[in-house]
């Protein structure tokens, strides 16, 4: 293995601490070419698609990318913001807000973000940390619930980058925070504030709140992935915080890909069934997505909405993700601070003068 070129080590180095927020990723532009490039990287990850690569790559390159590239580009174009991809825009804002909050509380740490797929990538971010004198790194995935296809592959990418370093930093990882009180509080506040502005569903009349999490193949549950259980745990805690029952609030799973069975119940068919059963209003919230993206804005806000209305529903509300909500920035900073304990994150105070 060839190691990265590095400057000579020095005892006078900065000895800084870095916090790296890691999200999934996004195409660089809403164009077929950019989307195909992004999907090629994403769908080539064996943590994401557990099919022998010799078979999968043929299907991916000859069938899936040519078909999905153009169709997905149209969807991205429908949600693209003036500043860029929603996921990148909101993740950048979250990073800036966490950095500001930690700094205002006396923390001397670098805070940056990276994407598992696309740019800025994890390897680049860790290299930038190293050049800035960072010797301790906290890897903070923006996935509250652990899954091998999200959290684990983010750690894989980080440790692959570290494997090329001769002088490695000390590293800590945040595995999940699905049941963290501050995270649950932020979720509940996001829902309450939305209802304060748009009206609360009439649950006595049969209205529904749906908590939609990203789906994964069911076989991953059978193979020991804790994701399903952690989604259910988050859902139960949020229901309790909102004072809702399981007849008023439902946990579902979205974004199914392929023909294999995924975690159920599926979001879109559930909303269709609600409409057909006479449910007049349905609100959908995505607790597992910490920032709005294609899957929340387009899939939930457009496709799932259309399913509900086509089934006979009358009013559909997509509650925005946590994004830059103050309760969430506070929660995220709290989780980061807890995982920095024991590291010299605050500047040494001068000795008092007698």
Swiss-Prot record:
It catalyses: heme b + 2 H(+) = protoporphyrin IX + Fe(2+). PROSITE patterns: FERROCHELATASE. InterPro entries: Ferrochelatase (IPR001015), Ferrochelatase_AS (IPR019772), Ferrochelatase_C (IPR033644), Ferrochelatase_N (IPR033659). Pathway: Porphyrin-containing compound metabolism; protoheme biosynthesis; protoheme from protoporphyrin-IX: step 1/1. Disulfide bonds: none annotated. GO terms for cellular component: cytoplasm. This is Ferrochelatase. Its EC number is 4.98.1.1. One of its GO terms (biological process) is heme biosynthetic process. It is found in: Cytoplasm. Keywords: Cytoplasm, Heme biosynthesis, Iron, Lyase, Metal-binding, Porphyrin biosynthesis. One of its GO terms (molecular function) is ferrochelatase activity. PANTHER family: FERROCHELATASE, FERROCHELATASE, MITOCHONDRIAL. Catalyzes the ferrous insertion into protoporphyrin IX. It is an enzyme of class 4 (lyase). Belongs to the ferrochelatase family.
